[in-house]
Amino acid sequence: MSIVNSSTIGVNLGNSDGATALFGLGNTVNGSDGSQWLYVYATAAMVTGTVACYSTAYVAQPATASNLFGAAGGSPNSGMGLAFAQGTFAAADYGWICIRGADQYVRVSSVSTVGAALYLDTASSGVLTTTAASGTMAGIILLTASSTGVQTAVRAYLQYPRLSPGALFGV
């Protein structure tokens, strides 16, 4: 687990702050292992490794194809960013989500291999898969493999996760 190394007092990385905002939405802090964290409001529950999409108002929810591409698919919703929960959030909680760092958790839906291409799982919100699906991801490299067919959190390297340009333009 990363620890904060910015000068912001009271930061609790990887855990929800509960229903009370302790920092301004959109604040960022740096942590150990080259990590960077963003303070958000979660509109839905998230567990460790959940891929979250957040708006320009720093409101986060588990990522789905419809909240990234709109209900009809096609054009990406403007201003949506991607990050990963490193702890448990209840709906209506505030807390820090990870946008960069080594050795962070990501949630995958099935068997995965180190360095494999990752996609947004269309069957489960906030989950990645190595099976070709909607939204090819970039800026995420798995560091550990999963040998189970159920959702699990595995370690990854994150560098400002995003949809690849091909996913944005239907390529």
Q: What is the role of each PLM region?
A:
Residues 1-171:
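Glycine-anchored, exposed beta-strand/edge motif detector
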